[in-house]
Amino acid sequence: MKNNLTFFVFIVIGIFSVTAAAPNWGVADTLEHYEIGPGIEYIKIRYESVPLTLWATTIDMTNPYNVIEQVQSNNSVPDLKRELVQDMSKRLTTPGHKVCAAFNHDFFSYDEGVCIGLNISNGVISMPAGSGRSTFAITQDKTASVFFPVPECKAISASGDEVTIDHFNWGAETIRNGDCVLFTNMNSLNLDADGRYIKIRPRSNWIVNGTPTVCDVLEVSDLPLQTSDTDFVLYLRNTKLNSLPDIKVGEEITISQKLVAGKFGTPPDNILQAFHGYPSIAYEGKLHDGEYNDFENGREYETSCRTMAGMSQDGKTVYFVATELSENSTGINCIDIANWMLAHGAWNVVNFDSGGSTAIVVDHTMLNLPGRGSLRPVMDGVLLVSTAPEDNGVAHYSFSKTQLNVPIISLAPLTLISQNKYKDVIERNVEVEGFAFRCEPAELGWVDKGAVFHAGETVMSGKIIAEKNGITAELPVSTRPVQDIHIAADEILIDSVRPYRINLEGNINGQVYTLDPAAFAWTSSNPSCCRIENGILKGIENGETSLVGTLDTITVGLKVIVEVTPETLVHENFSDLSDFPLFSTVSNTLSISHEELPTGWPDGAVLQFDQKTGRNPYVEMGKSYRLYSLPDSISLQLNLSKEALAAIKHIRFDFTHKNGKSYWQPEYIPSDTGDQTIAWAFSKNGIAFPTEDFPLTLDRIRFVLNPGSRSEITIPLRELKAYYPVKASSAINNVHIENNFAWITAEGELRLHYNLQQTGSADISIWTTAGQQISEYISNRELPGTYTYNIPDRFLSPGIYILTIRANGKKQSLKFRVK
């Protein structure tokens, strides 16, 4: 069954800028677009022609219930262990402080365990290593700005003595800058160097470029003192060993943290959070000449997955963009991302870490596939936080997109999200039971009980309205003309049990869409053999009919063959052996007869042969059987002696589908003697073979032999029998197979295949065997059918992994190996 995502018009994420042109990436498919928190919009976009998957998050800083925070891994400097972004998100979510989204941030030194530039967390400079190339700052009044950072920080005693602070915290090994160092409450080192130590405790919150922070002096010592969650340590040595000579316990000391103007930009007052931006990529609405093109080793042209940040001209809207590097998403350079951001509202753009560090996390789950081989813990991150009070009361429903743009007479599953009064998400993929849907105008289409939108026949604009418990959600809709409307198959075989939706397709600019057969008026040349309702066929009695569907001037046709199903049907009882072709690569005495049947067998036949030594040894029964109707399984009874068991390596059935091409070759390996039944279901891991592939034909049964020479091998056979469903829900016979709905194939590339038995979504996660989640993918709501997900094995380190999938109200776990 062919299934296709519907393409939607991209809704831009801010005020358009006319100073930059977005890269020519083709049509944008907006997969998701909704608020994930107060004033925090989340958008997932797909550019199929690149191909590229991009996430854009927009923060309205005027909303009183959101903040942006810089956080150090494990709240430690240095931190050689580092921390996954999703773990930062979980760790720092508390009542009234809900992390809605998180991103990786700065480049870092593995050996030193520190970021490479100046960062500020809640008003405290964590590490000014080299200060860096640019700073993306957020002030106390929630205004963003970008500038070149030049620190000027001091400690001032009560008597007016002062000393310049050269550095904040130290790295793990060799970073030992400055003779005056302020070790903050993020310090993770055990301080042991010679010098003077002054332990201080702040009386108020910290701020940069604001009122200096007054602290109490707790201890003064020539021996090392240690920091804590509440206490900082000012360390003096060498040229500054005797600075602040009169400082005493019980006095106050003032810490002034300032950033002054450098080569570009003006540092604002009252900075609470700041992020090192490495080179400034775009500044004041255009690429920042002398900065973006002064990236070491030409890294501005390096293609990779990446995270970048931007702000609007007034600093009141902030943007974060992340991309994926995977089998389905190519690497992009920072210039293209910056131009895309400029074209969609950004004024200034800076570059965060890229490659394997890139991470976007929503609801504590990493959405992008890890680049460069595996999950990478990072040194710091960006948190988008809701500070709204906890509230689980549903006040809003939203659709997962802000605009639906689909062809006429198409089918589009709808997804609803519930939010509280602050716009914090309560539930994604809300159950649609209890919702009332309507379309305005009515000619726009209709929504069925499974929340699938059936687009009308006329090109128009309107909206879908969903309502439950007096709460409504609206989705603007535009429909478009579609070309080349046709049925995917010219002829179809159906039974009297399973309904079949006519597979109607059309395309727009080469993109194929699933269309709604219920939009057509259908006539049948033989209505007694099957009926059709809303484009769905149901067989009644054996026969053939020609269906004609009409919509205005469009006409489509389909030949339908109905074969009513019995419960079972014996296709071969071996009563007539007059036309039974046999073949062998290693036997000249091959025969089949009714002689010497096993005791208790009323019928059947015995295959007999001698085996001589030879390559590729096998014996083959070449009689062909066109299987009646749509069986769900097939069986063959046989009886094996010790000699036959030793001779047989495996038994293979060769099936072809209706077009005569090789289709399926299941193998059975016998393990015991005596009566036994080979049984196979016409399915793959519980998923019935597509109706379009029937009828199936069993072309041959091959007994593949173990090498050697043997004489008088006999294999009794009886009843090649097909089994049929007796009701639609029993299309697969559970006697013969497990009730799975997903499976992995490894022919060339690792792929997950899964079957949706009803309209819905699939939640797919990849885990290490140690229980660490690597990635999560949640599909859009899709129509019933079989879908494929490409497993990103080439981006994973060698080893065993576990894939979990939730769909159809069930969970299934599968293992796979990366070599």
What is the predicted role of each segment?
Residues 21-525, 529-568, 701:
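Gly/Ser/Thr/Pro-rich low-complexity, intrinsically disordered segments
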Residues 733-736, 776, 798-819:
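C-terminal tail/sorting-segment detector
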Residues 767-774, 801:
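Short, glycine-anchored, charge-dense loop/turn motifs used at functional sites
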